[in-house]
A protein has these predicted regions:
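Residue-level recognition of oxygen-bearing side chains
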Residues: 68, 185, 198
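Terminal-tail/helix-coil boundary detector
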Residues: 200-210
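GST-like domain detector, emphasizing the conserved glutathione-binding G-site
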Residues: 1-127
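A broad structural signal for alpha-helix termini and local helix breaks/kinks
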Residues: 22, 47, 77, 148, ...
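Active-site-flanking alpha-helical
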Residues: 74, 169-170, 203
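GST-like fold's C-terminal all-alpha helical module
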Residues: 96, 100-195
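Short beta-strand(s) of the beta-wing in winged-helix/HTH DNA-binding folds
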Residues: 53-56, 154, 200
Length: 210
């Protein structure tokens, strides 16, 4: 059985949703580097930088990076529809997954941990970095929305890995509210992904409504 390290409200939600869609049995270990968690020491043993999601496969090999995990699951379980069967369409989906990971996902780190890029920032520097980082994040999402139209999903005829990752990472940094103003059709698509019956139960565990 696969083992997924993650915590509620984190990027591990995308991996969890993909595993559910693919019908792959897995167990979860609650672990996060930014808060006390029962599985943190175990996570550090398999992933020294303690990033989540981290997925341990049946053979003991370790997968990190959300895009890489989703690509693997899509290739290993083609019947799931996580990735397209057509090579050209699949190539664009992989491009989109890597775009989100390299640009939008990475940009969250500047908002949450500006001190990683600027040692001991004072309050003014911190706020300036976060403001510029947020503006850049929103710009990157706008570019993504323009480059990856829904037909009717980002993954094509079926909801897939690219939809899942976009709906996860867009929850942070005020991206959704910004997209509702600048790219309302794309924001509406994210809302459709949220309520899809294959995704909604996972989202309810990660982002429970008050």
């Amino acid at each position: 059985m696969l083992t997924l390290y993650g915590t509620r409200g984190s990027g591990s939600a995308s991996t969890e949703a993909a595993l559910e869609i693919a019908g792959v049995p897995y167990r979860t270990v609650d672990a996060a580097s930014w808060q006390p968690s029962p599985g943190l020491d175990e996570l550090r043993r398999v992933n020294p930088i303690a990033q989540i999601p981290t997925l341990v496969l049946d053979d003991g090999s370790i997968l990190t990076e959300s895009a890489a995990i989703l690509i693997h699951l899509g290739l290993a379980h083609p019947e799931s529809g996580l990735l397209a069967s057509d090579p050209a369409a699949r190539a664009q989906q992989i491009r989109g997954l890597v775009y989100i990971g390299a640009n939008c996902y990475a940009g969250i780190g500047i908002l949450d941990y500006p001190e990683r890029w600027y040692p001991d920032p004072d309050d003014a520097v911190r706020k300036a970095m976060q403001a510029r980082g947020r503006a850049r994040l929103h710009e990157l999402w706008q570019i993504f929305a323009d480059q990856f139209p829904a037909t009717p999903w980002l993954s094509g005829a079926r909801l897939g890995a690219l939809d899942i990752l976009a709906a996860t990472v867009s929850r942070w940094g005020g991206a959704r509210s910004a997209l509702a103003q600048s790219r309302p059709q794309f924001a509406a698509l994210l809302g459709r992904i949220d309520v899809d019956p294959r995704v909604a139960p996972v989202w309810a565990r990660h982002w429970p409504k008050p």
